[in-house]
Amino acid sequence: KGVMAGGPEAMYRAKENSEDDEDAARKDLEEAGMKKGDLLIGLAASGQTPYVLSGMKKAKEEGALTISISCVEEDKIGEYADIPIRLLCGPEILTGSTRLKAGTAEKMVLNMISTGAFVLCGKVYENLMVDLIPSNSKLVKRETRIVQEATGADEEEAEKALRECSRSAKEAIVMIKLGCDAESAKLALKKAGGFVRKAIKQ
């Protein structure tokens, strides 16, 4: 889940004063159901945005793990972070326009974190996104290619396995790799906690 100063509408219409609303941050996190054991990543290019700072404090009170991402050497949000990340990208070409270098740098770090999380959750096999949802024709074709690349199967065999596995690329890969039926592949994957590599090596 993600919360931001000003709410979702602030994505499309600027609400500059909302970043100073400390109470809103606490309320937003409560509504999001944040609890002990969760992870909160606080982003503020300046390292001192009141909304983010308040959210970091709330997370610490709840016993959540905290990561801060700022673009300055000395920040306030880092004081409340278990893992402070400071991206020293230097001044913006347009003074104060942190959507440029700072925003881009923060987005790159978020990409790294989310990609790592995907790997740790078993959504990746080798370098393939095996847990994608084939919600359009492009993704249906990509899913077939993923099964082919992971197993060495031809298109016909990959498609057959996907149909038998209710379009689950993970199950189709395990099925082909182990030479078993769809139900056995599903069971092997369940025993492996959703990790394709573990399911194949059981």
Regions from the PLM with identified roles:
Residues K1-M108, A117-C121:
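Glycine-rich phosphate-binding loops that contact phosphosugars or nucleotide phosphates
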Residues S97-A105, V109, L128-S135, L139:
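Alpha-helix N-cap/loop-to-helix boundary motif
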Residues A117-Q202:
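Short, amphipathic alpha-helical interaction segments embedded in low-complexity terminal/linker regions
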